[in-house]
Amino acid sequence: MLHTLPHCASSVDFPALLRLLKEGDALLLLQDGVTVAIEGNRFLESLRDAPITVYALKEDIDARGLGGQISDSVVRVDYTDFVRLTVKYANQMAW
């Protein structure tokens, strides 16, 4: 399943998001959600043990001036990659 997070983590039920993550899922951070990808962010730390891949939309990272602060554990993607993720994951959950 592809989970998309367009909001800062404190604006959503993040514990519920963590509970619903399954092995092989992906989490795409976009819009204000890219703040989760900042190195040392407590929400990112809680994702480290999850059996998922965390992606962040590069355009949203750049728009917020966060390029140098993003954790190396987060995969940066562009809009083309975003489309590929939506094709790869038939099921999606928007938070």
From Swiss-Prot:
This is Protein TusB. Keywords: Cytoplasm, tRNA processing. Gene3D superfamilies: DsrEFH-like. Heterohexamer, formed by a dimer of trimers. The hexameric TusBCD complex contains 2 copies each of TusB, TusC and TusD. The TusBCD complex interacts with TusE. Belongs to the DsrH/TusB family. GO terms for biological process: tRNA wobble position uridine thiolation. It is found in: Cytoplasm. It comes from the Bacteria. InterPro entries: DsrEFH-like, Sulphur_relay_TusB, Sulphur_relay_TusB/DsrH. One of its GO terms (cellular component) is sulfurtransferase complex. Part of a sulfur-relay system required for 2-thiolation of 5-methylaminomethyl-2-thiouridine (mnm(5)s(2)U) at tRNA wobble positions. Its main location: cytoplasm.
